[in-house]
Amino acid sequence: MSSFKEFKIKWGMVIDLDKCTGCGACMVACQAENNIAPQPDASNKLKSLNWLVVYELNNGKPFPEHDVAYLPRPCMQCGKPSCVSVCPVVATDKNEEGGIVSQVYPRCIGCRYCMASCPYHARYFNWFDPTWPEGMDKTLTPDVSVRPRGVVEKCTFCHHRFMQAKDKARVEGRDPSALRDGDYVTSCTEACPNGAIIFGDFNNPEHRVHELHKSKYAFRLLERLGTDPQVYYLSRREWVRRLGDNYLEHEKVKG
């Protein structure tokens, strides 16, 4: 896999799975913020579309040892994204400001190579033009484009909020390249009632995620693939960390 340069700013998430209750508030907030049209039947995998999905995990043991965890899965904004490597028209790329993997919809030709290459299944193809119930079209976020039929879309870490935070910093006479912790947060971070999703700059010591992602209980999904995800998870439960990278029984798990 080709290498990618390091960025001064590295936006990322730390998601505490021991705090997540699987309520789905993050999913709803993501849909509302990013103009994702609601579907009457969410089980219809052809028509339903979610940039953020919450998965239920369990340890496979019977009661009373049975245990459950919930895992929110946004785009991992990989440091070495396989989706970028395979796109024939450069419709997806690593953003220079923060390392977010961008998606340029007018360039996308709908080949879906990026979907096939993503090990996290975090990309979605628009088979249909989006439609909204009467009145809901007036509540769309003006800074987020509505994606047409025939293109691939995904989580962007609410990049429009990043642009807004930089504009606000300029107005206040601050350096837009040195945002404070909390100046720029994603909609899912804002909506989580338990504070399970923490967002910030991994490279900034003043941001909470700077220390959290170094915890001995931190892990990343399928880390051994070498994609360098910018989303970390926390859990004190070993079985949860073991599932994160498909560890075998004899392999030692971090933490």
From Swiss-Prot:
Entry keyword set: 3Fe-4S, 4Fe-4S, Electron transport, Iron, Iron-sulfur, Metal-binding, Oxidoreductase, Periplasm, Sulfate respiration, Transport
UniProt remark on cofactor binding: Binds 3 [4Fe-4S] cluster per subunit. Binds 1 [3Fe-4S] cluster per subunit.
The UniProt record lists the keyword Transport: yes
Organism name: Nitratidesulfovibrio vulgaris (strain ATCC 29579 / DSM 644 / CCUG 34227 / NCIMB 8303 / VKM B-1760 / Hildenborough)
Subcellular location, principal: periplasm
Pfam families: Fer4_11, Fer4_2
Organism lineage: Bacteria, Pseudomonadati, Thermodesulfobacteriota, Desulfovibrionia, Desulfovibrionales
Ligand binding ([4Fe-4S] cluster 2): C75, C78, C83, C87
SUPFAM superfamilies: 4Fe-4S ferredoxins
Any single GO CC term annotated in Swiss-Prot or TrEMBL for this entry: periplasmic space
Residue sites binding [3Fe-4S] cluster per the record: C155, C158, C188, C192
Cofactors named for this entry: [4Fe-4S] cluster; [3Fe-4S] cluster
Chain positions recorded as [4Fe-4S] cluster 1 binding sites: C20, C23, C26, C30
Keyword Metal-binding appears in the UniProt entry: yes
Gene designation per UniProt: qrcC
Domain of life: Bacteria
Protein name (database record): Menaquinone reductase, iron-sulfur cluster-binding subunit
Any one GO MF annotation of this record: 4 iron, 4 sulfur cluster binding
